[in-house]
Design a protein with these regions (language model features):
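A short acidic, Gly/Pro-enriched loop at the edge of an enzyme's catalytic core
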Residues: 85-96
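Conserved SAM-binding strand-loop segment of SAM-dependent methyltransferases
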Residues: 74-84
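Conserved SAM-binding motif I beta-strand of class I
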Residues: 52-57
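A short helix->loop->beta-strand "cap" motif at the edges of active sites that frequently abuts
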Residues: 50-51, 144
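SAM-dependent Rossmann-like transferase core, predominantly class I methyltransferases
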Residues: 1-48, 59, 86-87, 186-217
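Mobile active-site "lid"/loop adjacent to the S-adenosyl-L-methionine
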Residues: 100-128
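Conserved SAM-binding loop
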Residues: 66-67
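Conserved Class I SAM-dependent methyltransferase catalytic core
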Residues: 5, 126-184
Length: 218
């Protein structure tokens, strides 16, 4: 269930959920969902067996939606208000999932409210991706896994480099090609001007990175 003003589950959500369910999830697996939205991924992890799921979102409305969906599905989720990983401690999570905003925007000023906050990610689409890549080693337990979804429009190679720079091993484990939704349809002209889209291109490539913190890392 998606409440008014909360990003509803879409193709990117489902791609990441399928990838998440390919990971070993046990009752003691500590799972974190960054940018939880409706809580679809958090609920998926809890239904898969984790009894220790944390959902974080900057929007209080999203956290209410997450709590509601947890109740409707008979699972318990700790919903935390905060900006990405800021409210979280160190080395706490075995599995981190995130479907952050990743759509390149006209400028670098990020929305502070409204649905656009769910997809606008600065001029290069990397405002949130780069932060998650940099902060993941701090919140992951040794041997922990990050599953991070993004669009090819927001520079796949940059994510690979940044994850490796942070000492994580990283690879793409899931991909999908999806038709443009309303946001990319409206923004296609701008993205073509920047050389991010070819003339007539109307499908978006999505990828999921799987990044692992070494078992011996602090």
């Amino acid at each position: 269930m998606a409440s008014t003003g909360v990003y509803p589950p879409q193709s990117d959500t489902y791609l990441l959920a399928r990838t998440l369910l390919g990971e070993p999830i046990e009752p003691g697996t500590r799972v974190l969902d960054i940018g939880a939205g409706t809580g679809y991924l958090s609920v998926s992890a809890a239904l898969a067996g984790s009894r220790n799921v944390t959902a974080v979102d900057v929007a209080k409305r999203a956290l209410l939606n997450t709590r509601l969906n947890a109740t409707l599905n008979g699972v318990q989720i700790r919903a935390v208000h905060g900006d990405l990983t800021n409210p979280l401690g160190e080395n706490n999570f075995d599995l981190v999932v995130s479907n952050p905003p990743y759509v390149p925007a006209a400028g670098d000023t990020l929305p502070t409210g409204g649905l656009a906050r769910c997809w606008d990610a600065g001029r290069d689409g990397r405002a949130h991706l780069d932060r998650i890549c940099r902060e993941a080693p701090r919140i992951l337990a040794p041997g922990g896994v990050l599953l991070l979804l993004q669009s090819a429009l927001s520079n796949i190679d940059a994510t690979q480099r940044e994850l490796q720079r942070q000492g994580l091993t990283a690879e793409i484990v899931s991909t999908a090609q999806i038709p443009f939704g309303p946001v990319l349809t409206e923004r296609a002209s701008l993205l073509r001007q920047r050389g991010l889209l070819a003339p007539g291109e109307d499908r978006e490539k999505l990828v999921v990175f799987r990044a692992v913190k070494p078992s011996g890392a602090a």
